[in-house]
Amino acid sequence: MKAKKSGKSSGDQVAGKPVSASRSEMAEVVLPAQTNPLGKLLGGHVMHLVDIAAAMAAHRHSNSYVVTASVDYIDFRNSVSLGEIVMLKSQVNRVFHTSMEVGVEVYSENVLTGECKHTTTAYVTFVAIDEKTHRPKPVRPLILETPDEKRRYEEAAERRKTRLALRYGT
């Protein structure tokens, strides 16, 4: 499926939505219950936050319920310390038929110095679910507006190819 160039619908087609409409951000302070004995945010908690931030972007794009289908990649680059602010930014990278890939970037901010660092990158695939039948449903096209969005769109196709090859052994 190719990205639509405009948001106009023709016939039965649902109008596309720009990537910017899916962008989501969330943040929270890292508390003691979320850290390991070294005072670092637990990786499992980061994964939980990634899933929530990614789902928000998928909901915004599809205007439907979504379920997590896979986490293709998660890279922990830097740790997040107790008392820091953890910030997550997500956006839909590509739409397939009933699924969509969402990219998530995680950052930490030291509240004393203001220093921000990129800590984690993840790619999560969601399936849109019909609210009545609870079955997968088609997702509206994605409108690409910037060179970065086009790059992410192309890279998502490669990740999908790898994911499907691993899943089906081809």
Q: Could you say what each language-model-derived stretch is?
A:
Residues 2-8, 13-16, 24, 81-85, ...:
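HotDog/MaoC-like acyl-thioester-processing domains
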Residues 13, 19-21, 41, 52-89, ...:
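Hydrophobic beta-strand-centered segment that forms part of the acyl-chain substrate-binding groove
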Residues 18-32:
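Short amphipathic
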Residues 27-30, 75, 125:
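Generic structural detector for well-ordered beta-strands
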Residues 32, 54-62, 126, 160:
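Generic helix-packing signal
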Residues 33, 37, 131-132:
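Short, ordered coil/turn segments that flank beta-strands lining enzyme active or ligand-binding pockets
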Residues 35-48:
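A conserved, well-ordered hydrophobic junction motif at loop->secondary-structure transitions
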